[in-house]
């Protein structure tokens, strides 16, 4: 008799583990999509360790696990919780038990104080079940409420494999990082069909909410992956930089030498302040080999943000990119920096600012886009950060650009300069024109060039980096080829830095 019960249990479990009908599996395979349990096998070190509510809706037809797997496993030896939509079950849509399962795995992650990963592939809420799914105290809104409450306490990561529609689009929005699979992933509040019906706009799914659009234009996506396998490996790598929660320190890895280059750093940085160069060239020479994990590479590329290691110590890098738009800060790049700085500060990852910046962009277009507000957001995030902050002036740091890149007034733990550095309100050319425009206009044409050249040299002397070192505005002038060792020593020294908190609830952020 007992064997009959065991047989029933086994048969039910096998049906549930298979997910939806074969035709939906076939459709996913044609799109290059993996089955939800295949995704989890790749994500975890050794497959699922624990799975709750496996039998949710097992008495209903066609709703195995109610379309979502909630599980506990390990990544890099670290315990993590996972919510994973099964798109073979009603397109991964949410029913009442789906929502309850997601809420419960969030509550478990909170109790275990461990990272929570969302594998999203869902058509949204089931309209036919909206009373049980949508408005209640433990309805879908509770998922987003929980995400906000967990933010900064545990890492929250989104792997977006398919759609994340309507209100469900806020799951990725509230995560620390969103990895999207090109060609399949999408997120939008209203579908193209709805947009055409309501506002008369005809638009493709990719234009409305595709992975490439969100990773390059809206900034809602952080990393664009070519395949699901690549996306999963990226998330495993990302987690290696982070502690399990905000109460722990970021993990120290074994020290590795930097990548070998024939050309030393001193020969890579142009002495001409206006000559473009790729800041990646500097970064790769000061970090441990192959440790740069760039975030939002396609969005606002005039600023680089990413995680790296120096002598095994995780560090968050915020660097101007002179190769793109001269490294000028725009509203999008300021927004990009603010989010990244906040992320690193939440999980005790020191910040390294590499400044080569002519300032913030000017003009009516950026003013109307709110560059002052977004710039304030970046400066606010940088000022609020209590982790070790190292500022390096690579070449120019002009105007408010100096402030945004953790200049001396913002209490970085050190402000270092390379011999190529300049700090000023503006560059020599602009300064001479601003101060002497009337005088230049009055001079005979044959005398203007010599006058401008003379005043430019005077200005350069005024902003000489050794003068700033003499005045103790900067802490040290470092040979470029010694920068890595200098940063490693300072990171080690600053790791005992005391965290200070002010007696207020929170600032009024310029968001």
From Swiss-Prot:
The keyword DNA repair appears for this protein: no
GO BP terms, alphabetized: L-leucine catabolic process
Domain CoA carboxyltransferase N-terminal: 2-254
GO molecular function terms attached to this record: ATP binding; ligase activity
Pfam families: Carboxyl_trans
Domain CoA carboxyltransferase C-terminal: 260-506
Keywords: ATP-binding, Ligase, Nucleotide-binding
A single cellular component GO annotation: methylcrotonoyl-CoA carboxylase complex
Enzyme Commission numbers on file: 6.4.1.-
Region described as Carboxyltransferase: spans on this chain: 2-506
Domain of life: Bacteria
PANTHER family from the UniProt entry: ACETYL, PROPIONYL, PYRUVATE, AND GLUTACONYL CARBOXYLASE-RELATED, METHYLCROTONOYL-COA CARBOXYLASE BETA CHAIN, MITOCHONDRIAL
Similarity comment: Belongs to the AccD/PCCB family.
Protein's recorded name: Uncharacterized carboxylase YngE
Protein species of origin: Bacillus subtilis (strain 168)
The organism's taxonomic lineage, starting at the top: Bacteria, Bacillati, Bacillota, Bacilli, Bacillales
